[in-house]
Amino acid sequence: MPKMKSVRGAAKRFKVGKNKIKRGSAFRSHILTKKPSKRMRDLRQSQYVDSTNVSAVKKMLCI
């Protein structure tokens, strides 16, 4: 049986920790002038993948 291959785009976007999967925040690429500084600071922080999406992400990462 051949090796399982992960989705390369997903492998670049997600980091796997002990029990959770980390992801970066969205809404940070363009049209940034109208967004407040506090929101921009908050968006810099990484977040965890929601429980509804964990199984799909794990399947993409072959976990």
UniProtKB/Swiss-Prot annotation:
Cross-referenced InterPro entries: Ribosomal_bL35, Ribosomal_bL35-like, Ribosomal_bL35_CS, Ribosomal_bL35_sf
- Gene3D superfamilies recorded: 4.10.410.60
Could you tell me which PROSITE patterns the record lists for this protein? RIBOSOMAL_L35
Say yes or no: keyword Ribosomal protein present. Answer: yes
Keywords of the record, alphabetical order, are: Ribonucleoprotein, Ribosomal protein
- GO terms for biological process? translation
Q: Name one GO molecular function term.
A: structural constituent of ribosome
The record's Pfam families line, in alphabetical order, gives:
Ribosomal_L35p
GO cellular component entries? cytosolic large ribosomal subunit
Which HAMAP family does this chain map to? Ribosomal_bL35
| Protein family | Belongs to the bacterial ribosomal protein bL35 family.
Supply the name of the protein. Large ribosomal subunit protein bL35
